[in-house]
Every structure is written in structure tokens, then in C-alpha cells.
Amino acid sequence: MGRLVFVSFSLLVVFLSLSGTAADCPSGWSSYEGHCYKPFNEPKNWDDAERFCLEQAKGGHLVSIESSEEADFVAQLVANNVRRGISYIWIGLRVQGEEKQCSTKWSDGSSVNYENWIEALSKTCLGLEQDTNHKWVNIYCGEINPFVCKA
């Protein structure tokens, strides 16, 4: 009997610790490597999308992408959740300054350590282009596009 109680308790602890990881994300968000992600189909310009992400979850911002594995996760999330026929999806990176130099920080303040550019910088905001396997492209910041938030 004591052994059954111990096994039951052990299974409960494992279940609660595993479910706690997913419970850290708001309802409807996906979890990857300790962060929460959610694509939004309602198109917004870059600034409005960033503000919206700030309001959605504690620590929320437009998505920062820090590795090729995270890029693959975000690409799959977009492919499964953003309407077909949409060309661009906002990410949390934009050109800062007069010289059109890319900011060295994402909108969440993290450093840019991974890059997936398809073209040289010419406009001020960046997004994923669905037709190029989610490579990063320059987009006019006032354009309205769906976006992905990360918290």
C-alpha cells in the first residue's frame, strides 16, 4: 500500500511539473524554449503591433528570433495559424538611425545574434516573407501586416 502511495505521489509530481511549463503561457499561446508565442491575424502597422504585444502578456513584444531552431518554430507557427495569401508577418526588429543601420537589439531588448536576411536594408521595419520560407525582408513600417508576439 505504501509503495502504491509513493508511486502515485511521484507520478503526480511529474505531471504537475510538466504541466506547469505549459501553464506559464497565457491561454491560446504556444510554448518553446521557455517563451510563449502567439500569431495574430489582425493586421497592424509595426508600432501598433508592438504596442498590442505589450498589452497581451507580461514581457510581450513582437517576436525576436535568436536561432535557426527558433526560426523554424516561428515559421511553423505562422504556417499553421496565419491566413494563406498573406505575404509578410511583422517581427520585432527595425532599422534605427539615419544611416539605415539595423538595430543591434530586438524590440524586447535582446541582442541580434541570429540573422536570416533575404535582401539589403532599404526600409525601416522587418518581417518574415512567407514566399521565401520565412526569410527576413524590409517592409515600410506603416504597412499593415499580421504579426507574432513573444513573451
From Swiss-Prot:
Signal peptide feature range: 1-23
Q: Which SUPFAM superfamilies match?
A: C-type lectin-like (SSF56436)
Q: Does the keyword Hydrolase apply?
A: no
- SMART domains of this UniProt entry? CLECT
Disulfide bond sites:
C25-C36, C53-C149, C125-C141
Q: Which UniProt keywords apply?
A: Disulfide bond, Hemostasis impairing toxin, Secreted, Signal, Toxin
One cellular component term (GO) for this entry is: extracellular region
Localization: Secreted
C-type lectin domain: residues covered: 32-150
The molecular function terms of the Gene Ontology recorded here are: toxin activity
Q: In which tissues is it expressed?
A: Expressed by the venom gland.
Tell me which PROSITE patterns the record gives. C_TYPE_LECTIN_1, C_TYPE_LECTIN_2
> Mainly localized where?
secreted
Under the heading Pfam families, the entry gives: Lectin_C
Presence of keyword Secreted: yes
What assembly does the database describe for this protein? Answer: Heterodimer; disulfide-linked.
The entry sums up its family as follows: Belongs to the snaclec family.
Please give the function described in this protein's UniProt entry: Interferes with one step of hemostasis (modulation of platelet aggregation, or coagulation cascade, for example).
Report further notes. Answer: Shows greater sequence similarity to the alpha than beta subunits compared to other heterodimer snaclecs.
The protein's name: Snaclec 3
